[in-house]
Structure formats: C-alpha cells, structure tokens
C-alpha cells in the first residue's frame, strides 16, 4: 500500500464528515438541506453519465440504484431532522453507531457474512463496543442532572428511521449483486427524487436549496474516492478509514459550529468515538 493510496482512502471520511457541517453552516432547515443535498448529488451522477460510466442495459442495476438512492435520501433527511433537534456532535456518533449495528446485523443474519466462530465472536464484540460507544457519546451535561430531554427522545426515534434508510441503501446492492460503481448514476437520480418527495410539502427557498447543493457535491466526490481506494487498499481498510467521518463531523460540530459541551461530555464523546472507530475496524476486517 503506497502512502498516496492511503491518504486518498482517508478522503471519504473527510468529505462525508463535512457534509452535515456544511448543511448546518449554510443553514436553511432540514427540508432545504435534504432537497439541496440530493440535487447536489446529481452533479456527480451526470458527470458519470457524461464520461460514459453509466449503462442502461441492466434493469436490476437501474431499479436497485433508484430505490437505494431514495432510501439514502430518507436516511439523510431524518438525520438532518435529528441534527436540528440535538446538534451535529450528538447526532453523528449515534447515527454512525446505529448504521454500523444495522448493516452488520443484517449482513450477518440474512447474507451469511459471519460464517465462522471467530467471525461471530469478533462481530458480537464489535456490537457490544458500538453500544458502549453510542452510550458514551450520549452523556448528558452535568447541569442537566437526571431530567429527561424530550428533544433527545424524539431525535432517537428519528435516528431509528434514519438508520432503516441507510441500512437499506447499503444492503440492497449486496442482496441483488449490484456494485456501487454500476449503480451510482441511478442512485443519484433516486436520491434527488427522494429529496424532492421529502421536502415537497414544506416551505423551501431557492437560495437555501442552492447553497445546500454544495454538501451534495462533496458527498458524491467522497463516494468517488471510496470507489477508487477500495481496489488500492482493500475493502476492509477503506471501510474502516471511511468510518473516521464520525471524528470529522463531531469535532466540526463542536469547534466549527460552536456546539457547547462540558468536560464530562467531551470525555464521553472522545471515548465513544475511539470505541466506535475500534468497532468499525473490527467489522471492516470481518468483510
């Protein structure tokens, strides 16, 4: 593995971790954000079409691409709703952990990816670590005491819905044997359609939607780097490195967006991120 390939393999985490930061930074609320972001992915989709990287000769690829893209839009839209309620630095570690749990369990149970005792044991250890990591990143501020936070409870329900969308997006290609590179153009179409459906009954502005095109383009570029790096450094390494997005987004929420955390929460966030990253490395090496 060359150092350049390794550095390129880090770029998906940087790009994907920046998406929600930019969404919040440019503003517009979750419906402008999801509409703009999903339309932004079209720029990457049409660039693939223009360069001959989209084929229309396989109906399965087209349908899987459209449906999985719409599922991603559903997941992303609900993630943005959670961000609106509890912030980036609390949403992203929880959302990342939930996605890892969901995709791993689905792949293990329905796709038979855990075929040996070692894989089962290591997979269960990773699951436990993910739960611990999510719990650590969700610590309340000392001043909050033991009082219930209705916004946090609402956000957790929204993130469960978000996870369903994200898991569907990830596993659908595996179920039907469709590669991400083949489906990417059609996924961008599905994402745009999904984003429009999610936002159609809500007030949106052209300016805010236009500004939120930027994170959509950035997400798409991150995807291209992911597909480039996988054959260079391996699926396990590229997957594990991509999960570092949780560090980018969480710290961006705190230091760029100015989300306030006390010392107890900062310790919990750092500890939780480390545990989640360790779990993702274990899961990556089970692939």
Curated annotation (Swiss-Prot):
Which GO cellular component terms, listed alphabetically, does the Swiss-Prot or TrEMBL entry include?
A: plasma membrane
One GO MF annotation is: carbohydrate transmembrane transporter activity
The record ties this protein, via SUPFAM superfamilies, to: Multidrug resistance efflux transporter EmrE
Give the transmembrane region(s).
7-29, 34-56, 58-75, 114-136, 156-178, 183-202, 209-228, 233-255, 267-286
Which keywords label this protein?
Answer: Cell membrane, Membrane, Sugar transport, Transmembrane, Transmembrane helix, Transport
One Pfam match? Sugar_transport
Q: Where in the cell is it found?
A: Cell membrane
Q: How does it sit in the membrane?
A: Multi-pass membrane protein
Which protein family is named in the record? Belongs to the GRP transporter (TC 2.A.7.5) family.
Its biological purpose is as follows:
Involved in the uptake of glucose.
Q: What is this protein called?
A: Probable glucose uptake protein GlcU
Q: Which organism is it from?
A: Staphylococcus epidermidis (strain ATCC 35984 / DSM 28319 / BCRC 17069 / CCUG 31568 / BM 3577 / RP62A)
């Amino acid at each position: 593995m060359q150092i350049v390939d390794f550095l390129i393999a880090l770029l998906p985490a940087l790009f994907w971790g920046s998406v929600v930061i930019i969404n919040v930074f440019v503003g517009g609320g979750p419906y402008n954000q999801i509409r703009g972001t999903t339309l932004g992915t079209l720029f990457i989709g049409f660039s693939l079409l223009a360069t001959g990287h989209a084929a229309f000769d396989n109906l399965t690829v087209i349908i899987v691409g459209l449906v999985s893209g719409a599922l991603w839009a559903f997941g992303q839209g609900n993630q943005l709703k959670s961000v609106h309620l509890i912030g980036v630095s609390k949403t992203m570690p929880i959302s990342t952990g939930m996605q890892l749990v969901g995709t791993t369990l689905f792949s293990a149970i329905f796709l038979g990816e855990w075929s040996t005792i070692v894989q089962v044991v290591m997979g269960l250890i990773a699951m436990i670590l993910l739960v611990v990591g999510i719990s650590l990143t969700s610590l309340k501020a000392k001043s909050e005491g033991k009082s219930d936070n209705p916004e946090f409870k609402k956000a957790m329900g929204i993130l469960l819905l978000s996870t369903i969308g994200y898991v569907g997006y990830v596993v659908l290609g595996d179920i039907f044997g469709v590669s991400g590179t083949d489906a990417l153009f059609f996924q961008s179409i599905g994402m745009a359609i999904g984003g429009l459906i999610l936002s159609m009954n809500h007030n949106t502005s052209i300016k805010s939607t236009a500004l939120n095109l930027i994170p959509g383009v950035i997400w798409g570029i991150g995807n291209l780097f992911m597909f480039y790096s996988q054959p260079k450094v391996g699926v396990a390494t590229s997957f594990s490195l991509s999960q570092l997005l949780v560090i980018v987004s969480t710290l961006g929420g705190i230091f760029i967006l100015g989300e306030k955390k006390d010392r107890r929460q900062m310790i919990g966030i750092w500890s939780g991120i480390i545990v989640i990253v360790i779990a993702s490395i274990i899961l990556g090496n089970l692939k």
